[in-house]
Amino acid sequence: MMADEELGDEVKVFRRDEDADDDPMISGETSEQQLADDKKDAVMEAELDGAGRVPLIGGLKAEIKAEPSPSFPMPSMLPCGPYSPFSGLPIMFPMVVPQYLSPNPNINMMNMMTMRAAMAGAPLSPAFPAMFSPNPLFPFPGVVAKQHLENTMPMHMRAGPLSSLNHMKMPPYMPHQMMPQHNERRGHGGGKVKKEDHIKKPLNAFMWYMKENRPKLLEEVGNDQKQSAELNKELGKRWHDLPKEEQQKYFEMAKKDRESHKEKYPQWSARENYAVNKKKPKRKRDKSVVSGSENNDQKKCRARFGVTNTSMWCKPCQRKKKCIYATDRSGSELNDGHDGRGTSGGCSSSSESSSPNNNQPMPMNAPQTVAAMHAMLMGMQIGQSAHLASSHSTGSSGTSPPVANPSDSESDVDEDEDIDPTITQQTQEYIMQESVCTL
């Protein structure tokens, strides 16, 4: 078309020059008629010479003097690239469909793009046979083939300005037989998978009574608003008030139910409904607890010497206090907080003999340790009593010395309140030194 317009301009300029030179007195109407005829002949010759050109119909182009303008876009103004929305449209498309045109060129472009996208997915309409059907007037085999290919392709694979909208996530097409049966499951099962059938145990007599009389209880006035616990409580009271003759009826019903249940499920047991078969967690044994002779050191005097040998017990055990020889499971010693004396079962005393080879004291057993401690305390108490008696006799003249009562001395030894605190402190320090030497 560019060649046709250039040729028309050249003819127009040539005729104007020729008219000005040869016949300057020709009227305006005659010159315009002659110019239109010449332009018609030139365009016809150019179109007949070009291969694949569309022949004009009845001098359509000769009668219409079309010039490119923003309100009337010519085919030469439309982009014809491979990715353009106008690549598959016929050449005379803007002139055939003028109702989609607008004075605004941007709106014209959007109208063209929208129409092409609509026609790409729609079947060919018989209202526009000259635009899309391959006939002698508009032989467009390439356009028809391209449109046929686009019609066979899915919507989301077609090239076009609205192809991005076609990429939206939509459910794939599936035949009616292959559709998932979600609706059917929701209609029948409520959307929940049915669990395996749970075998219930047969009903007893009271359950049969409650099953039969619960609807009657609900029909009574005021019971429809009560909770289930209140209704069960009322049914229990009525069951206890029921005579034995009437209760026997429900016992027979329960017996028949048990027999039928046993015939139906011969291998069933009520233990299957409870957690009897579950594995119980094994209790881990405390590794700190040792067995044999080592465990003997952790026992108290009562467990170590027995109930009959109370003379071998330590003083805290005799007074039902914490034992000074027993140790807890962590290995630490249990000390008596009242009298402040505490030592291990393997401590040594002053009477133990040392080895001549290695100069290390030999540990004594528990009875020897207790006896040594008693002897030490008795000796210290006797020495203190003798010292006090001698000082008293020398200090007082003309008086007879007091007679010592052995029962009083024994009671003083047994009771901690009569022992001098200084002696107790010295005894504790001595015992601590001996225990350090043993360790």
Swiss-Prot record:
Sequence segments annotated as region (Involved in nuclear asymmetry):
87-138
Query: Can you name one GO molecular function term for this protein?
Result: DNA-binding transcription factor activity, RNA polymerase II-specific
Composition-biased stretches (Basic and acidic residues): 9-18, 254-265
Q: How is it modified after translation?
A: Phosphorylated on Ser-125 by lit-1 in the beta-catenin-lit-1 complex. Phosphorylation promotes the interaction of pop-1 and par-5 and the subsequent translocation of pop-1 from the nucleus to the cytoplasm.
Write out the biased-composition intervals (Low complexity): 346-365, 385-400
Q: Which GO terms describe its biological process?
A: asymmetric cell division; canonical Wnt signaling pathway; embryonic pattern specification; gonad morphogenesis; mesodermal cell fate determination; mesodermal cell fate specification; mitochondrial unfolded protein response; negative regulation of cell division
Q: Provide the residue ranges listed under DNA-binding region in this record.
A: 199-269
Q: What does this protein do?
A: Part of the Wnt signaling pathway essential for the specification of the mesodermal cell fate in early embryos. Required for asymmetrical division of somatic gonadal precursor descendants which initiate axis formation required to control organ shape. Similarly, involved in asymmetrical division of seam cells, a stem cell-like lineage. Represses expression of target genes via its interaction with hda-1 histone deacetylase. Required for specification of the M lineage-derived coelomocyte and sex myoblast fate.
What quaternary structure, including any partners, is listed in this protein's UniProt entry? Interacts with hda-1. Interacts with bar-1. Interacts with par-5; the interaction is direct and is enhanced by lit-1-mediated pop-1 phosphorylation. The interaction also leads to the subsequent nuclear export of pop-1. Interacts (when phosphorylated on Ser-125) with lit-1; the interaction is dependent on the beta-catenin-lit-1 complex. Interacts with wrm-1.
State what protein this is by name: Protein pop-1
Q: Native species of this protein?
A: Caenorhabditis briggsae
